[in-house]
């Protein structure tokens, strides 16, 4: 069979379903909107279905500002977030039929904390189950499950766990063999799309908006209520899990760190009752006056609740006076438990450098 060119200068966006034998791919053409993109940051595109056998195209939607996208694994459906409508839409590939999934729901799916002069995106991407019979979409806190054959009957998938605990959930995939992770490389551009199995445990990374703590939660076999596995004053990442052998317990391996501790490798052999440090990535830090960080909040004269980060030298003495450096740019309170490396910067304030040299650094969130 002859080769068929899918992507061109006019059609730079090509998204291929995980089903490699699919007859159609989704392509985005922004050619007629490129001039206006010089002043219009929304960057709309026309969406086409392209036949992989002959390169023919079928218009699916015009002038769409995409803020989230996911193809079903079998290539029969596409789920698109329209930033203008602030809703998710389901497209049926074979017919081009379009259904608004979220217009009649009582929760919002737009990022309501978006504060730049541009259209807001969704709260993450749609995540499909590998059989293409359902998919998940997140509101601000929780995930809803949709059936493409019954798109008007969404079901709460995470039991309201996120909203009840002021915690934002994000689906994450923890597997034994990374080579077996079903991932469409093109979809990584849209938030790391993945495929879920209905009869396997589904994991969620968690972020508590009140305490700023991070963690991990699970929904066993996709049916049981969401259960917190671990949460703490750290940033967690790169979770791996070794399934238990006969008579043994499973092992979690992951990275953990915060401002005061480097990002080290940890392991838990007892489902996070204890955590064992496996590496010492930055021993030289102990030779320096490092620092501490705390979350502060206050109310403005116009009744806006504000947050900020206060960094102090490790040897801080409350009875002494210190020079203060204020870094005033966007929002940073959500990075309370992020590790920061000392390094030169051409524009920002390197916080470890200043606190190590006897400064107090205050980083207030900016509200527009």
List each model region and its residues.
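Beta-propeller folds
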Residues: 1-252, 257-263, 267, 341
């Amino acid at each position: 069979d002859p080769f068929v060119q899918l992507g061109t200068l006019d059609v730079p966006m090509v998204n291929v379903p995980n089903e490699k034998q699919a007859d159609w791919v989704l392509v985005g053409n922004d050619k007629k909107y490129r001039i206006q993109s010089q002043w219009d940051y929304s960057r709309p595109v026309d969406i086409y279905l392209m036949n992989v056998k002959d390169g023919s195209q079928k218009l699916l939607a015009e002038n769409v500002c995409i803020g989230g996208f996911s193809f079903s694994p079998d290539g029969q459906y596409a789920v698109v977030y329209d930033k203008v409508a602030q809703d998710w839409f389901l497209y049926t590939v074979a017919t081009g039929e379009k259904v608004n999934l979220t217009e009649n729901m009582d929760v919002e799916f737009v990022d309501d904390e978006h504060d730049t002069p541009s259209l807001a995106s969704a709260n993450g991407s749609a995540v499909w189950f590998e059989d293409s019979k359902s998919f998940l979409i997140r509101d601000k806190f929780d995930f809803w499950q949709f059936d493409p054959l019954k798109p008007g009957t969404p079901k709460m998938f995470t039991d309201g766990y996120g909203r009840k605990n002021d915690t934002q959930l994000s689906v994450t995939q923890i597997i034994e063999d990374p080579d077996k992770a079903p991932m469409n490389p093109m979809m990584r551009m849209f938030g790391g799309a993945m495929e879920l199995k209905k009869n396997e445990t589904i994991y969620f990374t968690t972020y508590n908006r009140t305490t700023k703590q991070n963690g991990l939660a699970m929904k066993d076999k996709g049916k049981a209520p969401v259960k917190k596995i671990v949460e703490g004053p750290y940033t967690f990442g790169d979770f791996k899990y070794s399934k238990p052998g006969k008579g043994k317990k499973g092992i979690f391996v992951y990275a953990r760190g915060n401002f005061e501790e480097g990002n080290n490798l940890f392991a838990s052999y007892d489902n996070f009752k204890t955590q064992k440090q496996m590496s010492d990535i930055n021993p030289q830090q102990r030779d320096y006056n490092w620092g501490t960080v705390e979350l502060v909040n206050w109310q403005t004269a116009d009744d806006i609740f504000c947050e900020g980060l206060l960094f102090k030298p490790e040897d801080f003495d409350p009875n002494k006076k210190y020079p203060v450096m204020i870094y005033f740019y966007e929002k940073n309170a959500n990075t309370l438990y992020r590790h920061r490396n000392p390094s030169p910067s051409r524009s920002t304030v390197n916080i470890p450098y200043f606190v190590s040299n006897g400064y107090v650094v205050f980083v207030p969130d900016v509200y527009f």
